[in-house]
Amino acid sequence: MKWFLSLVVAGVCSAQSAEVGRWADHWADAYGVERELVHAVIEVESGGNPRAISNAGAAGVMQLMPDTAAAFRVRNRFDVEDNVRAGVAYLAWLRDLCGGDRRLMMASYIAGQNRVLRLGLDFTYSSEVHDYVTRVAYLYRRNRWETLLREGVETR
């Protein structure tokens, strides 16, 4: 019986993961945000769990705070499509606001754009922010490398 439940849970998790991946790719393409970056943010924020809730009150796959969700017209933060759409739209908005600087984008995503833009590039004031930016950057590079290998592009 245990093995059966494990298979059922694994199947549900795989289906959930596939759904998250499909919406991540769809909205990344729609908003012109790199797929690899969106997947890195999702992995760090929630591990792809649509039911994730943080101690600060962020919820869903991309861990949207209530105010951010409201600004991007999210009705249900636990709805995968709506959450990913809003999260990617927010990343696109941050990209434009931060002049394309991924470090500032990621620092703004975790700490809030007003706080980060006020401090400029000195987001090392917080070990949480620094660790977050470092982790997303690592996963982004890993995801990018995997994409290049999958596409058969030679790397140097």
Label for each model-derived stretch:
Residues S14-R156:
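Catalytic glycan-binding domains that act on GlcNAc-containing polysaccharides
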Residues W3-V12:
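Sec-dependent N-terminal signal peptides
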